Curated annotation (Swiss-Prot):
InterPro entries (UniProt xref): NatA_aux_su, TPR-like_helical_dom_sf, TPR_rpt
Organism: Schizosaccharomyces pombe (strain 972 / ATCC 24843) (Fission yeast)
GO biological process, one term: protein maturation
Subunit composition and interactions: Component of the N-terminal acetyltransferase A (NatA) complex.
Gene Ontology cellular component list: cytoplasm; cytosol; NatA complex; nucleus
Keyword set, alphabetical order: Cytoplasm, Nucleus, Repeat, TPR repeat, Transferase
Keyword Cytoplasm in annotation: yes
Any GO MF annotation of the entry: acetyltransferase activator activity
Transferase among keywords: yes
Protein name: N-terminal acetyltransferase A complex subunit-like protein C418.02
Mapped TPR repeat ranges: 8-41, 43-75, 76-109, 111-143, 145-177, 217-250, 262-296, 365-398, 399-432, 477-510
């Protein structure tokens, strides 16, 4: 490998400088002038690849950087460049491998260790992440960012005692802002949950640093939680009461206050009559907060205590403020407690016949509507419909009444009547997006997609492909799932795959959120926020919407694997019986139709003039999903949906597991096949055969 001359080295350095300033086109031209004379200089080839990557030519960038690292496998610069290109293309596994190769050459390079930490955090490799930050801390023990990141990685990797010790050190010895100190102290209770006898230690730290809290109520919240854990219920009752006075809308405080009362009563520290007085006092004190009253009622019901006063208050308050939604909050006790259901209906009937309901029109409407909802929750649809008709006769312009009527008709199997009621509710309030979305959802479930698109178009912006692409762009997952399943039922497989792939891309985008936030959260002391992000991200691919999309995609790809003619949907059988010449002619005509429809959509874009505030409109070259259908390897495409799923987190979904096991078997992934079919014996046999072959 020849070295660069003095002039070439100068040009190489200039190209590096231009690259660091973001002048990628200039940097590219400069390095190309070097490569004209030294076409196999590895660092120059790698730099060329980096520029191509930044200029959005990732494929060429990977080829160049891969070629550079093959020319000189001992070049740290080449491996680093290849790692960056992989990282930019979000191939984090290969990027991390390249960083490891670079670190093997330059083990004391802080920049490489730092960059690798981002990848380990994204991939959930928390023990290597802990070791990584430990290494960086050894290289620069005075770096505050390194220590904060090391502390957070210690918690994530399960080294809780180390995390606790580091927080103590940070609070006592480092120059942190009051906000960061307050956040670190607030994170201590989360650590003590994992340390045996850690509560007392953490409480001592909290008391020593009480003045560090920017918000004293944050300290009292933590102190109250500690008191409850240590079964000091008298103290926790007092502290939660103080918190409720300050934050009356915090439902968790009212629930914890009630639990403290109950545990104090069970331990013999509180008489039953005092317990009931405390609950009555809670209702009276926060009489304007419906959620607090509901939580008290559910608490009294769950403990088999007298709840008449509470229920009377809730009905009276809801009647005077016309809040029928309180019935919906009682969904569980209505369905599981017959005595409560009968008492509620009796009380509502009495209020309806009372003087106040007769004198104030809205009171009568409220009572009638709530009786309808109560019977609906109990499954008595005829009685529910009777009361609802009375409410509609009283106030025929209230949209919620027609929405309730639509739901009742759906439960009774009267589909057309339900859709008419939905339509009427939307007409009464044309600006209600939520109401329109519910109507559209049921239209889609009835496979009346075009009507649903018209309803939703009133709340959409102009985009290529209309409302469907706009909702995909705005990550409206419920629409993509419902529309995809509807199109699948209609055997419009191309469009259905388009919806399911949109969901996959959305979830993939969400899964990358961890990448940028590790060091940011660590530096700001937002440990709790990052841990919550990790927990959310870990369950992302197990969500119901993604599993529904996966089930739909697998169904289509397995059909395509069975026969290529299934791509034609309802006409599959007819086309399969045609001669080869006729099939080719039909395919040609089908392609022409798709191209014509595609051109119509593109012409709409060309005639549209966007405003200055709007982003340029993007044309989808495969709007109808035709390219997704003509794949040569449908099984590999289907595997893309299965790869991120953690099956041990999924309960139920039997049909999805059956289709997945079929796919695994076809692809020869026997371990996954046996695991999904619960064939433990087959799993052991396969493992033993592999062990024997290795030996």
């Amino acid at each position: 490998m020849s070295k660069l001359s003095e002039k070439e080295a100068f040009l190489f350095d200039r190209s590096i400088d231009q690259f660091e300033k973001g002048q990628y086109s200039k940097s590219l031209k400069t390095i190309q002038s070097v490569l004209k004379k030294k076409p196999k200089h590895p660092d120059s080839v790698a730099l060329l690849g980096l520029n191509l990557c930044k200029l959005h030519d990732s494929r060429s960038a990977l080829l160049k950087c891969g070629y550079a690292s093959s020319i000189d496998p001992k070049s740290q610069f080449c491996w680093h460049a290849l790692a960056i290109v992989y990282r930019e293309t979000k191939d984090y596994n290969n990027s991390l491998k390249c960083y490891q190769n670079a670190l093997a050459i330059s083990p004391n390079n802080e920049s490489l260790w730092y960059d690798a930490a981002y990848l380990q955090a994204q991939l959930g490799l928390y023990q290597p992440l802990f070791d990584n930050w430990n290494r960086l801390l050894q290289l620069d023990s005075s770096n505050l960012e390194y220590r904060l990141c090391f502390t957070l990685s210690a918690f994530l990797s399960g080294n809780y005692k180390e995390s606790l010790e580091q927080i103590q050190y940070l609070i006592s010895s480092c120059n942190l802002s009051p906000l960061v100190v307050s956040r670190l102290i607030s994170f201590l209770p989360r650590i003590c949950e994992h340390i045996e006898n850690g509560s007392q230690t953490v409480l001592e730290i909290l008391l020593m640093n009480q003045n560090s809290f920017l918000n004293n109520f944050n300290f009292e919240h933590i102190k109250a939680d500690f008191a409850f854990r240590q079964k000091n219920y008298e103290e926790s009752i007092y502290l939660y009461a103080r918190l409720l006075i300050k934050f009356p809308n915090r439902l968790d405080y009212s629930e914890k206050y009630l639990n403290s009362l109950w545990n104090f009563y069970k331990s013999g520290g509180l008489a039953l009559d005092l317990l009931l007085k405390r609950t009555d006092s809670l209702i009276k004190t926060f009489s304007e907060i419906l959620q607090t009253g509901i939580s008290v009622l559910i608490f009294l019901l769950s403990k088999n205590l007298d709840y008449d006063f509470c229920l009377n208050h809730l009905i009276s308050y809801s009647m005077h403020h016309f809040i029928p939604s309180f019935i919906s909050l009682l969904k569980i006790p209505l369905k599981t407690n017959d005595a409560f259901s009968k008492k509620l209906i009796t009380m509502l009937s009495n209020f309806r016949e009372g003087d106040s309901a007769k004198n104030i029109p809205t009171h009568k409407l409220w009572c009638t509507y709530c009786l309808c909802l109560a019977h609906y929750k109990l499954g008595d649809y005829e009685e529910s419909n009777y009361w609802l008709n009375l409410a509609i006769d009283h106030t025929p312009t209230y949209p919620e009444l027609f929405l309730a009527k639509a739901k009742i008709f759906l439960c009774m199997g009267e589909i057309e009547e339900a859709l008419c009621s939905f339509k009427r509710s939307v007409e009464l309030d044309k600006s209600d997006r939520a109401l329109a979305s519910k109507y559209a959802k049921y239209l889609i479930r009835m496979d009346r997609n075009e009507e649903a698109y018209i309803v939703l178009s009133k709340f959409s912006r102009f985009r290529f492909g209309g409302v469907c692409n706009y909702l995909a762009e705005t990550e409206c997952v419920w629409f993509l799932v419902e529309d995809g399943e509807s199109l699948l039922r209609q055997k419009l497989y191309g469009l259905a795959l388009k919806r399911f792939h949109s969901i996959y891309q959305i979830y993939k985008k969400w899964s990358f959120l961890k990448f940028d936030y590790f060091t940011q959260c660590a530096e700001d002391g937002e440990f709790q926020e990052y841990v919550e992000l990790v927990e959310w991200s870990d369950n992302l691919w197990s969500s119901t919407d993604y599993l529904r999309a996966t089930l739909g995609a697998l169904t289509i790809y397995l059909l395509l694997f069975e026969s290529k003619f299934n791509m034609y949907g309802n006409k599959a059988e007819e086309i399969s019986h045609m001669s080869e010449v006729e099939q080719i002619a039909y395919a040609r005509e089908d392609n022409k139709k798709i191209m014509k429809l595609q051109k119509i959509e593109e012409d709409k874009i060309k005639s549209y003039i966007p405003s200055e505030s709007e982003e340029p409109l993007v044309i989808d070259e495969d709007y109808f999903g035709h390219k997704l259908l003509i794949t040569d390897d449908p099984l590999t495409e289907a595997m893309r949906f299965l790869q991120p799923i953690c099956w041990h987190k999924i309960k139920g979904w039997g049909f999805l597991k059956i289709l997945s096991s079929k796919l695994y078997k076809l692809k020869g992934i026997i371990f996954c096949y046996y695991a999904l079919t619960n064939n433990i014996e087959g799993l052991h046999q396969k493992a033993n055969s592999l062990e024997t072959s290795v030996l």
